[in-house]
Amino acid sequence: MRSVLTISASLLFGLALSSVAHANDHKILGVIAMPRNETNDLTLKTPVCRIVKRIQLTADHGDIELSGASVYFKTARSASQSLNVPSSIKEGQTTGWININSDNDNKRCVSKITFSGHTVNSSDMARLKVIGDD
């Protein structure tokens, strides 16, 4: 129960950061607290439906191991797409851009992004920052 509250608090913190803008239309979509045990239902919901063409992932605090990620679009069919994410991200490291909306339909908006993974080499929970580019 405590880890659920911690994850919920982290998601709310991530939503508060979602309006922060960077150069070149890069926006922090949110921050996810990564538990120490493998978890496959870590969800980052976008507060508003947003068209995002690609994302970057940053390990803000601690090392992270990822076993998968998917992006979900707001459509009548609830379309989703599996993402090719690196298996590990070291603290302070940022991935290259990961393309989404690759089916030539750049008008689909992202409703949520889910991750499977956990914190490694740390007694504290790592933070995964998700940066979007529209």
From Swiss-Prot:
Residues spanning the signal sequence: 1-23
Q: Which UniProt keywords apply?
A: Signal
InterPro entries, per database record: UPF0412_YaaI
Family recorded in the similarity comment = Belongs to the UPF0412 family.
Protein name as catalogued: UPF0412 protein YaaI
* Annotated source species: Salmonella paratyphi B (strain ATCC BAA-1250 / SPB7)
